[in-house]
């Protein structure tokens, strides 16, 4: 651990070297200032793994393997008095022009507020190159396929900013319209019914490697003619505390008996 005091902005920067030891290591740092201020910091640094693209900063994230076809990203937005609350994290597969999973927290605070889907527009995710995404700002996928949200817009009424981010192409997959408007919508509602005083953590995923139902084409196109494969399966995985009223984060829970996975 090394520290550097930048006199220009009077900020103490703490730097860590890569941990190649094969085991986690910990360090405690006491910072004392001449004006009497003091802070104690404790760090736990996991061993570096060059097969993992990003370390899981949130407990519900799937493993994030390094793959040239995957783009990992997190969007942040306004939630209450916070301007930088996490909205969702995704793994975008450039081969399918879609995310294979979208992970997000869900609480009652996310589902009420000023966000209005009528004020949102479908469009490109600004953090991913346009040419890698489905062009959904021009309209839905061709054929009988809706622009199906992985993180539902109804789960982000907390602010217009968070609502708008759910309309990015990276949050969409081509869904057969009857499925999207019926069974998928029912499932989304059931997930919302699982919310509690503690945070519910959700991972929604699309799987492209199975056998298509006879009513589903192997692929469709967007309005620019780009090929967009259709998922063969979808899933939702949920994690929360059993009581729903612990007032603790998932990573603060010490016993698996206190958790509920669905």
Regions found by a protein language model. Give the residues of each.
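Surface-exposed binding patches on compact interaction domains or structured appendages
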Residues: 1-13
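Extracellular ectodomain segments of secreted/surface proteins
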Residues: 2-4, 42, 48
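Hydrophobic beta-strand core residues of beta-sandwich domains
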Residues: 4-6, 21, 229
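Generic recognition of long tandem-repeat/solenoid scaffolds
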Residues: 11-16, 83
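Well-ordered beta-strand positions in beta-sheet-rich domains
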Residues: 11-13, 28, 38-42
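Surface-exposed, short loops/turns at beta-strand junctions within beta-sandwich domains
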Residues: 17-24
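Surface-exposed loop/turn motifs at beta-strand-loop junctions within extracellular Ig-like
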Residues: 18, 33-37
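Domain-level detector for secreted/extracellular nuclease and nuclease-toxin modules, and
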Residues: 24-33, 44-262
């Amino acid at each position: 651990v090394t520290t550097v005091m930048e006199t220009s902005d009077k900020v103490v920067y703490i730097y860590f070297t890569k941990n190649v030891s094969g085991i986690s290591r910990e360090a405690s740092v006491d910072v004392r200032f001449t004006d009497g201020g003091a802070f104690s910091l404790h760090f736990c640094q996991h061993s570096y793994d060059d097969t993992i693209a990003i370390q899981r900063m949130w407990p519900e994230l799937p493993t994030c393997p390094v793959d040239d076809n995957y783009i990992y990203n997190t969007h942040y937005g306004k939630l209450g008095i916070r301007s930088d609350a996490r909205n969702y994290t995704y793994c975008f597969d450039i081969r399918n022009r879609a995310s294979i999973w979208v992970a997000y927290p869900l609480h009652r605070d996310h589902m009420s507020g000023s966000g209005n889907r009528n004020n949102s527009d479908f469009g490109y995710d600004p953090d991913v190159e346009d040419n890698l995404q489905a062009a959904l700002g021009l309209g839905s996928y061709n054929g009988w396929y809706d622009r199906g949200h992985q993180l539902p817009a109804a789960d982000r009424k907390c602010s217009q900013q968070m609502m708008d981010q759910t309309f990015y192409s990276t949050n969409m997959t081509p869904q057969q319209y009857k499925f999207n408007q019926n069974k998928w919508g029912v499932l989304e509602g059931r997930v919302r019914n699982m919310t509690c005083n503690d945070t519910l953590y959700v991972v929604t995923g699309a799987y492209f490697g199975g056998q298509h139902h006879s009513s589903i084409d192997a692929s469709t196109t967007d309005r620019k003619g780009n090929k967009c494969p259709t998922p063969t399966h979808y899933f939702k995985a949920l994690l929360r505390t059993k009581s729903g009223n612990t007032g603790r984060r998932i990573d603060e829970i010490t016993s698996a008996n206190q958790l509920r996975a669905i």
